[in-house]
């Protein structure tokens, strides 16, 4: 026997709601539980009217006599209920009415079976529309009384009297002199509100006077701090002149003449054209006097150069011997290997080729060093011959060089 769901019944509705026609009525099968062998489905007459859902065992005209009444505001949505791998036509017509997951909601989930898939879609659309209207009706019924309005944020606030007088200049100067211990002084140039008519000083003059006072106070505080912090460790340090002890008044700055560069410094930054013009301007008797003077002996190191050449020659000879030995060893291995033109695959052959390459590079480097040393020796001998030339030939060559340079210019 079917029990009445008295817990879900609501109070009497208003007159307009009772007189309104139902949105949808019809017979559907409702899920009533599981039996021993199969599920239990029973035919029920369902009436959707407003935000109420009426379910009865037989068709009735008066909703007051219906056994089960459900408020759609307690439900979240209505959707299709279908098993993924089921081929039965019955599973294509199932739909469920899911309750909302709010605390205190005791409304049950309802499962129905429509006559056809088209009827199922019609019931789903109608129930979802009714659920939306029920939720909106709950929001529309929220009323706000006139007495509970929020107060205006700026219109009703208390007004504050702004009649406080700004601080005077003397107070600001006193605060600045006592609060600035690191030498920084803040100047706040706020003019007093009630200046006396007997002192018609302008803003610029008052600013200049305040600035002079501030600079004087700053200089005095710095002198006191420096005298307390600096203690000379010796008589020499105490005898040195101090910049902070010099009088401020009467001190004038005298620009000094730029330092004259010596001939060596000028030659460092002179251009090639200036150097050539200076050499051309040298008189002939100066060159003759320089030529008559005995040549200054230039310290040569022939023994050191010879030792370097011998060392390079020995290293070159040793490197060539090692290279010849490695090449012979590599040729012997290549002849014994079959086929002769196969690429080297063992680590020993790769190491042999790498050694041969390195020895070849070393041999070429030693040969280059030997050539460089030979050029150095030749340049040294040529320089000696130039120093031992006669003064007349030296003067003649200098004149020829100067004429050649002039012709190029």
Swiss-Prot record:
GO cellular component: cytoplasm; muscle cell projection membrane; nucleus; ruffle membrane
SMART domains: PH
Residue numbers carrying Phosphoserine: 227, 271, 342
Marked site (Interacts with capping protein) residue numbers: 155, 157
Positions of region (Negative regulator of AP-1 activity): 308-409
The keyword Membrane appears for this protein: yes
UniProt xrefs under Gene3D superfamilies: Pleckstrin-homology domain (PH domain)/Phosphotyrosine-binding domain (PTB)
Ranges of residues in domain PH: 21-132
A GO BP annotation: regulation of myoblast fusion
Region (Interaction with capping proteins (CPs)) residue spans: 133-193
Region of interest: Interaction with ATM, CKIP, IFP35 and NMI: 136-308
Polar residues composition-biased segments: 390-402
Keywords, ordered alphabetically: Cytoplasm, Membrane, Nucleus, Phosphoprotein, Tumor suppressor
Site (Cleavage): 310-311, 345-346
Post-translational modification: C-terminal fragments could be released during apoptosis via caspase-3-dependent cleavage.
Primary role: Plays a role in the regulation of the actin cytoskeleton through its interactions with actin capping protein (CP). May function to target CK2 to the plasma membrane thereby serving as an adapter to facilitate the phosphorylation of CP by protein kinase 2 (CK2). Appears to target ATM to the plasma membrane. Also implicated in PI3K-regulated muscle differentiation, the regulation of AP-1 activity (plasma membrane bound AP-1 regulator that translocates to the nucleus) and the promotion of apoptosis induced by tumor necrosis factor TNF.
Assembly mode: Heterodimer or homodimer. Interacts with CK2 and actin capping subunits (capping protein CP-alpha and CP-beta). CKIP1 and CK2 together inhibit the activity of actin capping protein at the barbed ends of actin filaments. Interacts with ATM, IFP35, JUN, JUND, NMI and PI3K. Interacts with AKT1, AKT2 and AKT3 (each isozyme of PKB), PtdIns(3,5)P2, PtdIns(4,5)P2 and PtdIns(3,4,5)P2.
Name of protein: Pleckstrin homology domain-containing family O member 1
Protein's organism: Bos taurus (Bovine)
Gene of this entry: PLEKHO1
């Amino acid at each position: 026997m079917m029990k009445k769901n008295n817990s879900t019944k609501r109070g009497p509705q208003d007159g307009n709601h009772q007189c309104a026609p139902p949105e949808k009525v019809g017979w559907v099968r409702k899920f009533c539980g599981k039996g021993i062998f199969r599920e239990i489905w029973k035919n029920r007459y369902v009436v959707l009217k407003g935000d109420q859902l009426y379910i009865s065992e037989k068709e009735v005209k008066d909703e007051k006599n219906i056994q089960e009444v459900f408020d759609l505001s307690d439900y979240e949505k209505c959707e299709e209920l279908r098993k993924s791998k089921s081929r039965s036509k019955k599973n294509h017509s199932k739909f469920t009415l899911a309750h909302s997951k709010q605390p205190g909601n005791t409304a049950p989930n309802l499962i129905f079976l429509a006559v056809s898939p088209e009827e199922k879609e019609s019931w789903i659309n109608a129930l979802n529309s009714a659920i939306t209207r029920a939720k909106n009706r709950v929001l529309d019924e929220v009323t706000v009384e006139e007495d509970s309005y929020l107060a205006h944020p700026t219109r009703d606030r208390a007004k504050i009297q702004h009649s406080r007088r700004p601080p005077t200049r003397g107070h600001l100067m006193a605060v600045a002199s006592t609060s600035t211990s690191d030498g920084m002084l803040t100047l706040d140039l706020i003019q007093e509100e009630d200046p006396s008519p007997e002192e018609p000083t302008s803003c610029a003059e008052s600013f200049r006077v305040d600035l002079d006072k501030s600079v004087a106070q700053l200089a005095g505080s710095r002198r006191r701090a420096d005298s307390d912090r600096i203690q000379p460790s010796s008589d020499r340090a105490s005898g040195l002149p101090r910049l902070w002890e010099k009088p401020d008044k009467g001190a004038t700055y005298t620009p000094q003449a730029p330092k004259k560069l010596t001939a060596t410094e000028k030659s460092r930054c002179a251009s090639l054209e200036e150097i050539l013009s200076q050499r051309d301007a040298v008189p002939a008797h100066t060159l003759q006097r320089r030529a008559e003077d005995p040549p200054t002996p230039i310290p040569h190191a022939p023994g050191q150069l010879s030792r370097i050449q011998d060392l390079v020659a020995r290293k070159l000879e040793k490197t060539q011997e090692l290279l010849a030995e490695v090449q012979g060893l590599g040729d012997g291995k290549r002849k014994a290997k079959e086929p002769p033109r196969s690429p080297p695959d063992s680590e020993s052959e790769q190491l042999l080729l790498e050694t041969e390459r390195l020895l070849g590079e070393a041999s070429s480097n030693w040969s280059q060093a030997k050539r460089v040393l030979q050029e150095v020796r030749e340049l040294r001998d040529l320089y000696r011959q130039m120093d031992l030339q006669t003064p007349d030939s030296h003067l003649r060559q200098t004149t020829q060089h100067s004429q050649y340079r002039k012709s190029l210019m």
